[in-house]
Structures are given as C-alpha cells and as structure tokens.
Design a protein with these regions (language model features):
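Ubiquitin-like/PB1-type beta-grasp interaction modules and other compact soluble beta-rich domains
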Residues: 1-77
Length: 78
C-alpha cells in the first residue's frame, strides 16, 4: 500500500533521497506508524507529533491505502 509522508524540521534527515518535500512510501497492508518509523530508521525515542490524515496518531495507529502522514517535533518554530 502507498502512503504520502511529510517530515518537518529534524525529521527531514530521515526522508529518502534529498529529503525536500513530501514523498510516497510503500508499506505492507496493515502497517503501523511504528513499522513506518522503523522502515525510515526514525528513532522512536524522539519526541514527536504524528498526524495521519490530520488526526493525532500513536505508534500503534494503522495505515490504509492513500493515507497521509505528517511528522514533526513537539516544538517546531517557523
């Protein structure tokens, strides 16, 4: 299944390739946010906020085809 991922601030370094802008990620059906973090090598001990389709997610939230994931640190300024 394919999801759209956007990483902000210190999390951008975990994006494949250039790390600039959103990217598509293929995951197995029923994958969780924890699986996604492990796949991208994002340490789970980082303080973060994750939104799936605009709703707050936990590490055990499950993805569905076409979902959108946004990850940013708890404190992030513009």
């Amino acid at each position: 299944m394919r999801i759209r991922v956007t990483l902000y601030s210190e999390f951008k370094k975990y994006a494949p390739g250039s790390g600039s802008g959103p990217f598509d990620l293929n995951l197995p059906p029923g994958a969780s946010l924890l699986y996604c973090f492990n796949h991208l090598k994002i340490p789970v001990n980082n303080e973060f906020t994750a939104l799936i389709n605009g709703r707050r997610a936990s590490l055990y939230s499950l993805f569905r085809e076409g979902d959108s994931l946004v990850v940013f640190p708890l404190i992030c300024g513009g």
